[in-house]
Amino acid sequence: MLQDKGLSESEEAFRAPGSALGEASASNAANAPEPALAAPGLSGAALGSPPGPGADAAAAAAAAAAAEQTIENIKVGLHEKELWKKFHEAGTEMIITKAGRRMFPSYKVKVTGMNPKTKYILLIDIVPADDHRYKFCDNKWMVAGKAEPAMPGRLYVHPDSPATGAHWMRQLVSFQKLKLTNNHLDPFGHIILNSMHKYQPRLHIVKADENNAFGSKNTAFCTHVFPETSFISVTSYQNHKITQLKIENNPFAKGFRGSDDSDLRVARLQSKEYPVISKSIMRQRLVSTQLSAKPDVSPLHGAHQALQHYQYENGAHMQFAAAEPQDLPLNTFPAQRDSSLFYHCLKRRDSARHLDLPCKRSYLEAPPAVGEDHYFRSPPPYDQQMLSPSYCSEVTPREACMYSGSGPEITGVSGVDDLPPPPLSCNMWTSVSPYTSYSVQTMETVPYQSFPTHFTATTMMPRLPAISAPSSQPPGNSHFSVYNQLSQSQVRERGPTTSFQRERGLPSVCERKPPSPHLNAANEFLYSQSFSLSREASLQYHSGMGTVENWTDG
């Protein structure tokens, strides 16, 4: 409330040039008796002089002289004067924004010569230094025309006002919270300025009256002006020298430290182990590396050579630069046949061993003595096959390798003769309903032909007839056999006892279709552990079942 009152009254006193402050400073002697007379408690009786008009006049003159001497004896020194001189020599610029921006260097002063018990009010106003508008051209400021009409003058009263002289002289008086704005409708009390105009800050020290206020006609005050604090208001820095001075001296000037050429300097100041490479240097290195590289070398390799000795801020760029083209993530666009073979058959078979199939954990409890190789010897499920865009397009040239294997693959992966028949696995059940986690895709390149029903679902497995063309089935694969339903005794003979008991019902009829004639020419035995579902058929084909010539249940 005190500051509001002071602002309203001070605006009347400092409104126009030649205001009450200037008039009072010009005629201090004439106005001196009036505030002395208005001061309470200053009478002849109080001073101990005999009553009378002459005594009262003498006492009033002595009190006025003491008050005048107190105001005149106040000395003010500018803090960081050398820094202000550096800015002044280069042409000080101050940023103004709509929201308001603080000044740098901050306006700080050291005050001496005050009466320790008298209360004072300290305030600042910023007035135009001339009537010109400026522009920055050829690395110097030039007059561009006549100044725009001045904004309504505002005063910034120090938050500690009013305070005793002892308080002001105890430490530096800082006006660092003062903000400059170009918003003519600013409601926050910031100093309103016009851009590209020159201004001069002024410090006023006013003696507070009996109401701890100022602005009356007879108020005693003094004004201090430092020419090195003059500046030109700008919305962005024009002179690079001023920008450099702000960066070197302002610890809060973080907005300028992310530029291109200052990255290395800031890295050295912060003593980083790996310097941050600026964008301009990185761009030059990339261009020079690509120009010196061979025409058939991709820009990705050139970027890798330029970045191998440095640490870039974004780790993702380093990962892609260090990776080879075939190791990059798969794109969603179909690639050509020569460049789309990211995984061959052996890799897919090896990676299939480490798959964590949900059906294994859900329907089986694998005994610890049985190796993982019995469960994962087949191609991966169809949902993984459909994730790779290049897999379906390469089914025809790789179907012999994927489903049956040839030569080295049979002996290394699934051609072991001395292995016992595998225990119950996830795709040996004829009574389990299709799993919802498998999204099965019908492959037109491997058509199936209708085949009559060769067995029915009963409690025990009947004898199965041998399939024609036995010459296409190599010896030693009898362990790839059909398991419709095995009793608990059969499980004990072939492996450790499992605690799982099937509770599902058996379907009435299961049809099985023989492999395609396209596969008979290349396949040496039927593929195992895979599901296929035809959208036109209403039954499920369990293709993970092989055949045996002579089957006995006992």
Curated annotation (Swiss-Prot):
GO molecular function, one term: DNA-binding transcription factor activity, RNA polymerase II-specific
Pfam families with a match to the protein in the record: T-box
Coiled coil: none
GO CC, one annotated term: chromatin
Signal peptide positions (record): none
Top-level taxonomic group: Eukaryota
Record field: compositional bias (Basic and acidic residues): 1-14, 491-509
Residue(s) carrying Phosphoserine: S516
CDD domains: T-box_TBX4_5-like
SUPFAM superfamilies tied to this protein: p53-like transcription factors
DNA-binding residue intervals: 78-258
Localization annotation: Nucleus
Keywords from the named record: Developmental protein, DNA-binding, Nucleus, Phosphoprotein, Transcription, Transcription regulation
Biased segments, Low complexity type: 18-34
Residue ranges of the region described as Disordered: 1-34, 488-509
Any single biological process term in GO: regulation of transcription by RNA polymerase II
Function: Transcriptional regulator that has an essential role in the organogenesis of lungs, pelvis, and hindlimbs.
Name of the featured protein: T-box transcription factor TBX4
Origin species: Canis lupus familiaris
Lineage start: Eukaryota, Metazoa, Chordata, Craniata, Vertebrata
